[in-house]
Amino acid sequence: MQSERRRKILEIVQETGGRSVTELCEQFDVSEMTIRRDLRDLDREGLLRKVHGGAVSNLGRSYEPPYAVRTTRNDEKKRAIGRMAASLVEDGDSLALDVGTTTLEIAHALQGKRNLTILTASLPIANEIVANLSLTTEVRLILTGGIVRSGELSMIGSIAARTYSDFHVDKAFIGVGGISLDAGLTEYNLEDAMVKKPMIQNAQQRIVVADSSKVGRTTFTAVAPLTVANTLITDSDIDRTMVNALEDLGIEVMIAKEGD
């Protein structure tokens, strides 16, 4: 009962942009204390923003849910995307693995690959590689360096961007905040976007990995036009008209199915 009410509260706030405690009490016929507790817990999960007297949606273009929250969202879809992306990696490849929860799933799925060089600005990805792959026979790991972004465990700043500028890789696996026909590839954070740009520029093959919730969305800052992408790997919930539009631009769309 509680979880269903909170799910509906979240839907209402996201659809309308915001609701007062009084309005939600009337709609669900519960006490103010109950609604305030629901809003507090939803805020702690990063699903909405609690304000004085109510709550507002956090789906603005500059708001990105915390990393710890994103790791629990669409996790089965992300795992499927990660497996499909890893299947494109060949022994001997040099890779750039972007920061993010979907690219982390690629690192999970790289076991069995040999003689890889992996460049990343992500501490969770580096930790995954160190823990589960042999750095002597299978992987050479390069961290970009830079300033660690609090809460994200990723590296940003001129050092990180310059490192990507100094290396040319076979394949870059790119995570983004949004993919739209009008705005192209976009991100929530300007500093993240500045690090992604040289990574994309210096990759021979550019593979965007994003669950379908990112498709059709525009976030805060531009990263690159859509046409830089050779491939998009996403899940089966993507709108078919968007698939057709992307393919018309020459972008291969690969659908990762859960359980494959």
Annotate the PLM regions.
Residues 4-24, 29-32, 43-44, 50, ...:
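Conserved phosphate- and dinucleotide-binding cores of soluble alpha/beta proteins
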Residues 64-72, 143-145:
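Short glycine/proline- and acidic residue-enriched helix-loop micro-motifs
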Residues 117-118, 171:
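A residue-level structural signature of the nucleotidyltransferase/glycosyltransferase Rossmann-like core
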